[in-house]
Swiss-Prot record:
The keyword Transmembrane helix applies. This is Photosystem I reaction center subunit XII. It comes from Synechococcus sp. (strain CC9605). Belongs to the PsaM family. It is found in: Cellular thylakoid membrane. It comes from the Bacteria. GO terms for biological process: photosynthesis. Coiled coil: none annotated. Its main location: membrane.
Length: 34
C-alpha cells in the first residue's frame, strides 16, 4: 500500500488537524471553567 500525497494535500490535512485540535482545546477549556 503506497500513498503518494502532494504538497497541497499534506498542507490541507495539517490545517484540518490543527483546526480540530484548536476546537477540542477550546471545548476542554470551556468545560473545565464551567
Amino acid at each position: 500500500m503506497e500513498t503518494v500525497l502532494s504538497a497541497p494535500e499534506v498542507f490541507i490535512a495539517l490545517v484540518v488537524a490543527a483546526h480540530a485540535a484548536v476546537l477540542a482545546l477550546r471545548l476542554s477549556i470551556s468545560l473545565y471553567e464551567a
